[in-house]
């Protein structure tokens, strides 16, 4: 399977609007039993999440996984920091890239791959407001061109 393929459970569509994605990395997530059940039920929010590297380990911060309904006392804190499973070489590469100005790690999507929950992390640089407007303008122009081509080819 190619990188990022699998049953997509959650996507962070706002991330591609707010950031220039330089590169992507697939990482596993350390979850408790009730958390993986909630993730498989697609009860996960990536909107405010980000990843950081501390003491040679990668961590996923501010990602909300809703408590499992039948979890009772086994439910963990929905906003807890979760460890990401990456190779040491990938962590050092990302740590070196993060030293650049304005770089951050953003979760792009969560999906299941061979029964395991994976997160696609993007190394990103923040966009300015004029970049966002330019992206919207370019997307609208492409949509208009496709509409005109479709109308022209229908004749």
Swiss-Prot record:
It holds the Pfam family SmpB. Keywords: Cytoplasm, RNA-binding. It is found in: Cytoplasm. PROSITE patterns: SSRP. One of its GO terms (molecular function) is RNA binding. One of its GO terms (biological process) is trans-translation. PANTHER family: SSRA-BINDING PROTEIN, TMRNA-BINDING COMPONENT OF TRANS-TRANSLATION TAGGING COMPLEX. Belongs to the SmpB family. This is SsrA-binding protein. The lineage of its organism: Bacteria, Bacillati, Bacillota, Bacilli, Lactobacillales.
